[in-house]
């Protein structure tokens, strides 16, 4: 099904008129459909570790080469053009004899920063790297993939069975995956916008969720919107999850429901 057909399915659930093209029509139904499409799609994708929207990738931190190290009143001053750090950032330093470890930075300008609480000592000639790391609690941070909706698992070994419900500890904050792995193998739900790949049960769930938003936007705050959302949460989403789990090792705490029950809710 196309995006327009899915939105039309949602509109049909609330008695709305069908659209010819969801991206170009100018009717109130089309405007509302476009307004809530992204919200509903991201919510539905986040609700389950869908097989059709799963990607796996390897993330590895990249260290930045240091240009020079000098003495600034007893503190270690590091020079690197466009270093990208701000005061308060934490950096892990390697191969600088007087500053091996992690330090908080004081930004001097775009090309230099000092290491707080460091003690300069002679002996540096060249080389060394730095890496921006979380301020506390974790050893590394990896930028989220640009198409990531939700991170599902982070492991340290590509041969580890990522279909099982196990993962190394991690946390997602401000566009980064925080963990203790320099190289992380990540399974995540990606923002799959190819509606032709959506299973029928997911389409039914998505259109029902979208209808709950459209009902309130087009008809005002009424019980219809809440009723449709309940149908999504209690019936359509569990049904889609059940179908997804049967394709392989998925989440096992799922329920299934019949299409007849779905039809009766909208009779």
What are these regions (language model features)?
Residues 1-65, 131-267:
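Glycine-enriched, solvent-exposed interface loops adjoining structured elements
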Residues 63-135:
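Small/polar beta-strand repeat architecture
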């Amino acid at each position: 099904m196309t995006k327009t057909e899915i939105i039309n399915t949602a509109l049909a659930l609330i008695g709305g008129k069908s659209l010819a093209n969801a991206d170009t029509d100018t009717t109130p139904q089309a405007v509302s459909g476009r307004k809530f499409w992204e919200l509903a799609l991201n919510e539905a994708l986040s609700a389950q570790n869908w097989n059709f929207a799963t990607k796996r990738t390897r993330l590895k931190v990249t260290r930045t080469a240091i240009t020079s190290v000098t003495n600034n009143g007893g503190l270690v001053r590091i020079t690197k053009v466009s270093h990208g750090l701000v005061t308060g950032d934490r950096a892990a330093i390697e191969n600088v004899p007087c500053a091996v470890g992690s330090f908080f930075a004081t930004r001097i300008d775009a090309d230099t920063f000092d290491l707080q609480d460091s003690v300069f000592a002679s002996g540096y000639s060249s080389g060394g790297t730095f890496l921006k790391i979380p301020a506390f609690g974790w050893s590394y941070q990896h930028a989220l993939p640009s198409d990531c909706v939700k991170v599902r698992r982070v492991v340290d070994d590509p041969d580890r069975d990522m279909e099982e419900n196990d993962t190394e500890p991690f946390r997602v904050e401000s566009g980064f995956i925080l963990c203790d792995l320099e190289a992380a193998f990540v399974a995540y739900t990606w923002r799959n916008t190819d509606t032709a790949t959506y299973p029928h049960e997911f389409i039914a769930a998505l259109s029902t969720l979208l209808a709950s938003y459209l009902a309130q936007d087009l008809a005002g705050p009424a019980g219809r919107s809440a009723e449709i959302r309940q149908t999504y949460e209690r019936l359509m989403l569990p049904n889609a999850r059940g179908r997804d789990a049967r394709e392989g090792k998925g989440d096992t705490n799922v329920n299934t429901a019949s299409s007849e029950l779905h039809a009766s809710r909208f009779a």
